[in-house]
Amino acid sequence: MLMPKRVKYRKVQRGRMKGDAQRGTTISFGSYGLKALEPAWITNRQIEAARIAMNRYMKRDGKIWIRIFPDKPVTKKAAETRMGSGKGSPEFWVSVVKPGRIMFEADGVPLDVATEAFRLAAKKLPIKTKFIVRPDLEG
């Protein structure tokens, strides 16, 4: 499971997901990518589930790059706890993903294998996504 080794602050504010992604919007490492079309918090479990789905379909051929990292702690209060008495304890980690962000990349497999692998990975994520090919490979 992905999570930071250590953080400066244990708890952070929720924040807002305004606008499109400014960074990480182009394919940098592989030939194929999975681009987010909606804003969302992607949990470390969802990232791991998508990674496993891709690895299983690609039969460990090729290489996968995970371009997002869950660096935001999400807190939760215990069940049946009254309001007040401070903020809850950190429960899990999320990555803040905005539209246009490349979340996963792959290389070393044929186009049809990559397309299906990313389709299976996209099913594990709570947002709409788009399969993209590096511009110099199209045509």
From Swiss-Prot:
Example of a GO biological process term: translation
Gene3D superfamilies named in the record: Ribosomal protein L10e/L16
Lineage: superkingdom: Bacteria
Keyword annotations of the record: Ribonucleoprotein, Ribosomal protein, RNA-binding, rRNA-binding, tRNA-binding
InterPro entries on file: Ribosomal_uL16, Ribosomal_uL16_bact-type, Ribosomal_uL16_CS, Ribosomal_uL16_dom, Ribosomal_uL16_sf
Subunit structure: Part of the 50S ribosomal subunit.
NCBIfam families: rplP_bact
Protein family according to the UniProt entry: Belongs to the universal ribosomal protein uL16 family.
Identification of the protein by name: Large ribosomal subunit protein uL16
Organism ancestry: Bacteria, Pseudomonadati, Chlorobiota, Chlorobiia, Chlorobiales
